[in-house]
Amino acid sequence: MTDQSHQCVIIGIAGASASGKSLIASTLYRELREQVGDEHIGVIPEDSYYKDQSHLSMEERVKTNYDHPNAMDHSLLFQHLQALKRGSAIELPVYSYVEHTRMQETVRVEPKKVIILEGILLLTDARLREEMNFSIFVDTPLDICLMRRIKRDVNERGRSMDSVMAQYQKTVRPMFLQFIEPSKQYADIIVPRGGKNRIAIDILKAKISQFFE
């Protein structure tokens, strides 16, 4: 864990796929932004750092285990976090869930006082944990996560229900048990019931607000 005197404060939010991480991150961002302004807080999704697969065929891309740490370019994410802490802007990769690879364009992200980082595998990497000022694990039952994942992937990512279920059984659940669940031990705060836990969100807001004082 890093010293809180750093210019850029990194807050990590991890948990299972469809556990409510993104909802918590977006709620914190939206409500804190109203207090401090866009220039002081930002969100970076770990999904942006899925490795480039443009050299692979679509058939090969869909076979990738996206719930394994090896699917992530954590080295690039680590470098970007260090750059933000030095006060340098980064070029955030853009990942397409439809094409299963990075796009050519990037999004410029300027340094902020607080960066909220959210993703399933954040706490599995010791380098990333060291860059976080504190970390959160969203602890939601897997059956609820599965229902949310089916709804999200079918409606928002152009997936079929059969493909979502097959991926869940083959990689999502096994990788959660092997990598994500054990990483909960590294979290400073564990949030049950996902993004609808208003009390937890208010506590997190109060904690994060201290960094703006």
Curated annotation (Swiss-Prot):
The UniProt keywords, alphabetically, are: ATP-binding, Cytoplasm, Kinase, Nucleotide-binding, Transferase
The record's EC number reads: 2.7.1.48
Task: Name the Gene Ontology biological process terms.
Answer: CTP salvage; UMP salvage
Question: Which compartments is it annotated to reside in?
Answer: Cytoplasm
Q: Which InterPro entries match?
A: P-loop_NTPase, PRK/URK, Uridine_kinase, Uridine_kinase-like
Under catalytic activity, the entry for this protein gives: uridine + ATP = UMP + ADP + H(+); cytidine + ATP = CMP + ADP + H(+)
Q: Provide GO CC annotations from the record.
A: cytoplasm
Q: Which Pfam families match?
A: PRK
Superkingdom is: Bacteria
Q: In which pathway does it act?
A: Pyrimidine metabolism; CTP biosynthesis via salvage pathway; CTP from cytidine: step 1/3; Pyrimidine metabolism; UMP biosynthesis via salvage pathway; UMP from uridine: step 1/1
Molecular functions (GO terms): ATP binding; cytidine kinase activity; uridine kinase activity
Keyword Kinase: yes or no? yes
Family designation? Belongs to the uridine kinase family.
HAMAP family attached to this UniProt entry: Uridine_kinase
User: What protein is this chain from?
Assistant: Uridine kinase
